[in-house]
């Protein structure tokens, strides 16, 4: 018995004594041979060194790089779309007078970048309605759903089986019974609370569903990164929606924890709808293992808007791309700003490039305004956000907390001329790790409308002054520094 005990003890001693060595070897192999930011590399090495077992678990949850996985290699869109893009590039390079209308003067380089990096066509015949209240947004959406004649494409990161989706679900089942093609694409992590049997039941009712990046064991979803954070609805190619609202009762102010939910969502009519349709179909093809590009009728029926037109590009980013297109648009817009920058975001964890660009803008006399929530929905991210906000406050930016519920709006307005709004937060996760989609709108009227909304929000905000920030308690400072130190792991 004692000999067996000694053998076991020797084995345990050997394992413990070599654990650090093998852990560091593992860390070098998996971290250095994947493309990532140097700060992220060192953060992972320190975590794996000091907390070997727990660090490994965290790496499984957050750390792996998916850039080179075949599962994210998405093919280019149909040839005729690429042809239109090449023609726009030629006109921009030759400074074609028709192409360079007043709205995009000064932003030709950004338009060109979006054409080259993301095949984002510039469309000029778009109507845009801006929703900042969930009840108004979903009333409009459900009315558009009831008017569908050919197809309904719905994609959300979070769909909860509650009072809101019950209303939407009834409409979808009714339209499917009328012969309308209905597709619902949802993220496995965001919708993990919904039972698989529910989606199966919807399929039986004629509503096609597909799950993005499912786990082998549904209740054991280990992949926190690389989630599909997009929120897109396309109806008959006549109207599309994109923005920050998911589907759940909290988004229509029925959750006691958050109270009023302040978000931003766009309703679009015009040729930009095609950009969102293509984006949905690319994601659907991957999740459903289907090729809807073989269905040309799904790309017909685009109609111009009927009111004041605006120029727009639909841009997207994710781990399937070699460029961080949304990040680069934010960075370029900040660098091009001459008068003012307005930012709303629930999470403010910028990389060094964007943080430095914002600080340079402040020191150059540009008015920089940043609005964040007054309450956390994810405490770790909130305290990291507050740390970076502190940098901006000390640099001279105008920073505010929204105190009338929870702020989930995501976007930026520059010089009252251009706005970039959609699903992407101002953080590392949205820039590099998740699948996102934004609309870049080159239009003074819509940009000024969004500035006016921002100014109205200020009535229920509290400004974070230098004195207020410096006087924060030691406990809060410690939280900030710990969370900021770990923020590269996001």
Regions found by a protein language model. Give the residues of each.
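N-terminal localization/anchoring segments of enzymes in phospholipid and broader phosphate metabolism
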Residues: 1-328, 332, 336, 360, ...
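Helical hairpin unit composed of two closely spaced alpha helices linked by a short loop
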Residues: 337-339, 347-369, 373, 378
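Histidine/acidic-residue-rich catalytic or RNA/ligand-binding cores of hydrolases
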Residues: 353-355, 382-384, 414
């Amino acid at each position: 018995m004692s000999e067996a005990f000694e053998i076991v003890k020797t084995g345990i001693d050997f394992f413990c004594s070599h654990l650090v060595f093998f852990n560091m070897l593992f860390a070098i192999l998996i971290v250095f041979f994947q493309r990532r930011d140097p700060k992220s590399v060192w953060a992972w090495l320190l975590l794996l060194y000091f907390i070997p077992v727990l660090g490994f678990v965290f790496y499984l949850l957050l750390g792996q790089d998916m850039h080179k996985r075949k599962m994210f290699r998405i093919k280019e869109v149909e040839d005729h779309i690429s042809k239109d893009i090449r023609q726009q590039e030629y006109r921009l390079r030759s400074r074609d007078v028709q192409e360079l209308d007043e709205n995009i003067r000064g932003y030709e380089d950004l338009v060109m970048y979006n054409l080259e990096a993301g095949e984002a066509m510039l469309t000029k015949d778009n109507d845009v309605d801006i929703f900042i209240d969930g009840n108004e947004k979903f009333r409009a959406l459900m009315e558009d759903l009831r008017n569908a004649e050919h197809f309904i494409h719905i994609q959300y990161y979070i769909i909860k089986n509650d009072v809101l989706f019950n209303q939407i679900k009834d409409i979808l089942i009714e339209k499917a019974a009328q012969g309308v093609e209905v597709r619902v694409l949802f993220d496995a992590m965001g919708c993990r609370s919904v039972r698989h049997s529910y989606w199966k039941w919807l399929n039986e009712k004629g509503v096609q569903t597909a799950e993005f990046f499912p786990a082998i064991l549904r209740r054991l979803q280990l992949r926190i990164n690389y989630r599909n954070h997009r929120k897109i609805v396309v109806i008959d190619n006549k109207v599309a929606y994109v923005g920050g609202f998911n589907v759940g009762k909290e988004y229509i102010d029925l959750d006691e924890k958050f109270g009023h939910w302040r978000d931003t969502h766009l309703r679009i009519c015009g040729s930009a709808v095609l950009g969102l349709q293509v984006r949905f179909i690319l994601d659907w093809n991957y999740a459903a293992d289907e090729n809807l590009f073989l269905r040309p009728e799904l790309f017909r029926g685009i109609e111009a808007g009927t009111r004041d037109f605006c120029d727009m590009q639909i841009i997207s980013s994710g781990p399937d791309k070699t460029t961080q297109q949304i990040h680069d648009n934010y960075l370029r817009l900040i660098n091009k700003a001459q008068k003012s920058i307005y930012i709303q975001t629930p999470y403010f964890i910028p990389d060094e490039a964007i943080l430095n660009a914002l600080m340079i803008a402040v020191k150059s006399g540009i008015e920089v305004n940043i609005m964040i929530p007054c309450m956390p929905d994810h405490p770790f991210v909130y305290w990291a956000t507050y740390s970076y906000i502190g940098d901006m406050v000390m640099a001279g930016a105008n920073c505010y907390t929204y105190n009338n519920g929870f702020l989930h709006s995501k976007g930026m307005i520059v010089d009252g001329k251009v706005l970039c709004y959609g699903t992407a937060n101002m953080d590392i996760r949205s820039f590099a790790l998740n699948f996102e989609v934004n609309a870049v709108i080159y239009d003074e009227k819509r940009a000024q409308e969004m500035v006016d909304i921002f100014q109205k929000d200020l009535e229920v905000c509290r400004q974070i002054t230098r004195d207020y920030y410096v006087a924060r308690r030691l406990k809060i400072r410690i939280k900030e520094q710990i969370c900021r130190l770990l923020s590269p792991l996001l």
